[in-house]
Amino acid sequence: MREIDLLGFHSAATRRGWTSWPATPPLEGSLLDGAVQGADAVRAVIGGARQLYDRQDFNFAGPWGDNSFIEDYTAEVRGAPIGAVHLITFNADGKAQHIIVNYRPLSSLMFFSRLLREKFAGTPYAEHYLAGEV
């Protein structure tokens, strides 16, 4: 079984110590317009999102097939319930190749995306999130 650290997620995977990232693992997902590129950018975006969670309850976190890792959890952001599924795929060298982060339901996803745009205001990351009032 592969040992993994998902960019600072506070999950069982985080405590396993896997930190091998290529120069630009793209991060895509339902919250984002476009892809976030680069390990530092991905860490900032994921870390910023985690800071807004009031709570996080894991349903599953573990290997998915031969070259992937998946997390399924529910969280709460300012009282709004939100569900998430994160899929990380690895290349032949065992490094993260692609990260997909999807949230549900749509109303919570839109609320969370607007909060993240506010959080990242003045940074290059803000443009990836939904504009408008929270």
Model-derived regions, located:
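C-terminal and inter-domain tail/linker signature
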Residues: 1-134
